[in-house]
Amino acid sequence: MIVAGVDEVGRGCLFGPVWAAAVILKAEAFDRLPALGVTDSKALSAKRRQALLPEIHSHCLSYGLGQASAACIDAVGIRAATELAMCRALQRLCHSPDHVLVDGSLPLRPWPGSQETVVAGDSHCLAIACASILAKEGRDALLQRLDQRWPGYGLASHKGYGTKAHRTALLQWGPTPLHRLSFLAPELKGGSPAGASSGNLE
């Protein structure tokens, strides 16, 4: 039976897409990766996550990434957008899973196949832990690039979360097209930066 683990990152951010990864591991991964310290991405430093990436890639039978944009989040809500990102990640796997392990307590409603929720799955399930690392590193790399486009917001440091520095930048500059307006308090929704263009509803 082919089992995939799926996890998301960026659900609580004020900026940018919610990102997901799905992973199907090779049999030998279950000995090798725990010995290397693979666990929940939140428990690992950025340097350690980056060091683990090639090991995770080499021990995957298949992996896929998916995202849903800030515009999509504003349109359909964070839960539906997160489900969309997860389904996109699963659909990009090279092998169709017989069963999906979903991090958290909420089922993946659009997924038509067999699935199981795993509370704190990124700490207790190796495939979900690997997915959490791939999702985190993928989204962080995107935020590093977007920091160059909007350098005044500190995106490379806070990764879109609602830190004091991020909120101060919003008060000064207003939201970019990639901010989630539905997540912002009224006082943070001022004018958009000069030259801004609308984000895609994906």
Curated annotation (Swiss-Prot):
Domain of life: Bacteria
Pfam families: RNase_HII (PF01351)
Cofactor: Mn(2+); Mg(2+)
Binding, a divalent metal cation: D7, E8, D103
GO CC field: cytoplasm; ribonuclease H2 complex
Cofactor info, note text: Manganese or magnesium. Binds 1 divalent metal ion per monomer in the absence of substrate. May bind a second metal ion after substrate binding.
Family: Belongs to the RNase HII family.
Protein name: Ribonuclease HII
Origin species: Synechococcus sp. (strain RCC307)
